[in-house]
């Protein structure tokens, strides 16, 4: 949310697009993630939440977007995101990438770390928007029951 809130103050319209990443195993489906993000961005009138299974560069072209905003937590994030920015620009020369560094209190966070903390019953209010903590805890509990 840190990056979304800051980017929404920079742009007249911000589209948050939930994409599919075959290399990740998300806790929520794409549709569920869209709904969760809509819930926590409801107070931001210039934010639209969407989803796509196409390449980001193609999605941006179709939507008429000229800038992609990416959040960075660490130097290792930059290496990966820089490569993606170059590829996206190659596919869609009208597309630029803007990098925003996460505020310092979020730099160490990762989704896997938050999942693990949640599995151990740690209070997640410092890590997640309060509106979605119950959804997160419910999903963790249902996964525990599977094992």
Regions found by a protein language model. Name each.
Residues 1-147:
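Nucleotidyltransferase catalytic core that binds NTPs
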């Amino acid at each position: 949310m840190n990056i979304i809130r800051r980017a929404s103050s920079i742009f007249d319209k911000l589209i948050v697009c939930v994409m599919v990443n075959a290399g990740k195993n998300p806790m929520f489906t794409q549709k569920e993630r869209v709904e969760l993000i809509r819930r926590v961005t409801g107070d931001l009138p210039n934010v639209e939440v969407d989803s796509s299974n196409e390449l980001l560069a193609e999605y941006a072209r179709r939507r008429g977007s000229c800038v992609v905003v990416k959040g960075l937590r660490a130097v290792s994030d930059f290496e990966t995101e820089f490569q993606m920015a170059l590829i996206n620009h190659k596919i869609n020369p009208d597309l630029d990438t803007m990098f925003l560094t996460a505020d310092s209190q979020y730099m160490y966070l990762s989704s896997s770390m938050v999942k693990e903390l949640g599995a151990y019953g740690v209070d997640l209010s410092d890590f997640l928007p309060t509106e979605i903590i119950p959804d997160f805890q419910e999903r963790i509990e249902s996964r525990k029951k599977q094992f």
